């Protein structure tokens, strides 16, 4: 707000006319930007027990705070001040030295990410693993111990056509993949006797019409 213009509302010159908002307000009532303005200090009615921020402007004159006056009144036995309540003192459990300015006297700091206090936070449990698909290759079985070497069962993953009854011991070794190669090579296609006869009759009929030049 400009310091040269006094604070007042514009009044209309005509009597009985309804005043509009644009006539009551003026641009002189709007203050210019104040820049980076932040709430960096707070001193409550408790004085020294109810303050935080940079109070170095006091220059060591902490007896001017209302909290110290309340303490002196309690020692004297007289309570003349209207505000007699005080807040709790520091929550960190240690007192600041007298030579330093009490910055953030009763503020609570949040744990730093990755710090020692963050390790005590509860961690979310990992989701359960999905069931293993049948197309995956079976994992190699662990080596049996010498004590249980006498009774060793070979386990395999059931195929898609087999009933889903879990893992079952394999009595024999798996057959090789090329065992049915011979049956695939000996595949014969039978078109049926009726189709073959019709094809042969058409071929013979066409050959009979063809005239061989002499």
From Swiss-Prot:
Pfam families: BORG_CEP, PBD. The modification Phosphoserine is found at residues 31, 101, 137, 141, 145. Residues 119-177 are annotated as: Disordered. Its main location: membrane. InterPro entries: Cdc42_effect-like, Cdc42_Effector_BORG/CEP, Cdc42_effector_prot_2, CRIB_dom. Probably involved in the organization of the actin cytoskeleton. May act downstream of CDC42 to induce actin filament assembly leading to cell shape changes. Induces pseudopodia formation in fibroblasts in a CDC42-dependent manner. The lineage of its organism: Eukaryota, Metazoa, Chordata, Craniata, Vertebrata. This is Cdc42 effector protein 2. Keywords: Acetylation, Cell shape, Cytoplasm, Cytoskeleton, Membrane, Phosphoprotein. It comes from Mus musculus (Mouse). PANTHER family: CDC42 EFFECTOR PROTEIN 2, CDC42 EFFECTOR PROTEIN BORG.
């Amino acid at each position: 707000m400009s310091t040269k213009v006094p604070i007042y509302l514009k009044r209309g010159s005509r009597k009985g006319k309804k005043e509009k908002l644009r006539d009551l307000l003026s641009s002189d009532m709007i203050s210019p930007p104040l820049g980076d303005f932040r709430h960096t200090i707070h001193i409550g009615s408790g004085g020294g027990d109810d303050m935080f921020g940079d109070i170095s402007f006091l220059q060591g004159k902490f007896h001017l705070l209302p909290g110290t006056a309340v303490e002196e009144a309690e020692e004297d036995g007289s309570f003349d001040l209207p505000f007699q309540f005080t807040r709790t003192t520091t929550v960190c459990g240690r007192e600041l030295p007298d030579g330093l300015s009490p910055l953030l006297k009763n503020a609570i700091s949040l744990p730093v990410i990755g710090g020692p206090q963050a390790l005590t936070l509860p961690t979310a449990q990992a989701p359960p693993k999905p069931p293993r698909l049948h197309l995956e290759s079976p994992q190699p079985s662990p080596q049996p111990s010498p004590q249980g070497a006498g009774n060793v069962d070979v386990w395999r993953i059931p195929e898609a056509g087999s009933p889903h009854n879990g893992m079952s011991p394999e009595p024999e070794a798996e057959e090789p993949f090329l065992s049915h190669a011979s049956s695939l090579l000996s595949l014969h296609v039978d078109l049926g006797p009726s189709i073959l006869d019709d094809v042969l009759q058409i071929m013979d009929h066409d050959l009979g019409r063809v005239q061989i030049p002499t």
